[in-house]
Amino acid sequence: MSTIDILSPSGDNAGTVELPAEIFDVEKISIPLLHQVVVAQLAAARQGTHKVKRRGEVRGGGKKPYRQKGTGRARQGSTRAPQFAGGGVVHGPTPRDYSQRTPKKMKAAALRHALTDRARNARIHVITGVIEGETPSTKAAKSFLGKVSERKNVLLVIERSDEAALLSARNLPQVHILEPGQLNTYDVLVSDDVVFTQAAFESFVSGAPQSSAADTEGSEA
C-alpha cells in the first residue's frame, strides 16, 4: 500500500492518504483485459442509427421505364434499381446495436488495472479541493491543476455536491470531470493524470469493488 501527499489549493501539503493495494496495486496488469473493456465501452457509445434506402424504399420508380423488348437496351423494371442514379443502395448500412456484453466483474477488474498503471507511474493525485472557498474561479482552478500536473489531459474526480469545483473546472478544455461512481477504464487510460478531491477519493475507495481472480490473469505491463 503506497502513500501519496494531499495538496491544498494554496499549494501546501495537507497530509497524506494511502492508496489501497487491492485497487491501486494489483499484481499483474492485463493488457488484453483493458483492451476488451475499452473496445466494448467505445462500441456501446456508438449510436448505430445509420440507414440507407433500398430499392423498395426509395420514392418513385413504380412505372416500367420502357417496354421489355424492341429498344435494343437492357431490360429494366424500375428507375429505382441500384444501377440508376437516384436508385436504392445495395448492401448498405442498417440500424444496429453495437454494444457488447461485458460482465460487471470484468469492468471492475479493468478499472483496477488502469488505476494501478496510473498509480505506479505517480499519476494519481489527491487534493483537498479545486479552489479555496466557495466562489467558483476558472482561473484559480486552471492555475492549481497546472501545479498538480504539467501533463496535458487531466481526469478530475469530484463529488456531485461539489458545485464550486464543477463550475470552476468545467470550461477547461483539457480537464474531464467525473463523479466517483462514473469512473471508468477508458477515461482513466485516455487521461494523463487522475486527480481526486479528498471527498471523492474517500467515496470511491469505500464503494469500489475489491480485487478478484480476474486481477491475477493476463500479462504484466
From Swiss-Prot:
Q: Which InterPro entries match?
A: Ribosomal_uL4, Ribosomal_uL4-like, Ribosomal_uL4_dom_sf
Which GO biological process entries does UniProt record here? translation
Q: Does the keyword Ribosomal protein apply?
A: yes
Query: Which residues lie in Basic residues bias regions?
Result: 61-72
Task: Give a GO molecular function annotation for the protein.
Answer: structural constituent of ribosome
Superkingdom field: Bacteria
The record, for Pfam families, names: Ribosomal_L4
Q: Which GO terms describe its cellular component?
A: ribonucleoprotein complex; ribosome
The alphabetized UniProt keywords are:
Ribonucleoprotein, Ribosomal protein, RNA-binding, rRNA-binding
- Per the record, which residues fall in region Disordered? 44-102
Protein family per UniProt = Belongs to the universal ribosomal protein uL4 family.
Subunit structure and binding partners? Part of the 50S ribosomal subunit.
Q: What does this protein do?
A: One of the primary rRNA binding proteins, this protein initially binds near the 5'-end of the 23S rRNA. It is important during the early stages of 50S assembly. It makes multiple contacts with different domains of the 23S rRNA in the assembled 50S subunit and ribosome.
The record's annotation in PANTHER family points to: 50S RIBOSOMAL PROTEIN L4, LARGE RIBOSOMAL SUBUNIT PROTEIN UL4M
- List the protein's name: Large ribosomal subunit protein uL4
Q: Which organism is it from?
A: Streptomyces avermitilis (strain ATCC 31267 / DSM 46492 / JCM 5070 / NBRC 14893 / NCIMB 12804 / NRRL 8165 / MA-4680)
Recite the lineage of the species. Answer: Bacteria, Bacillati, Actinomycetota, Actinomycetes, Kitasatosporales
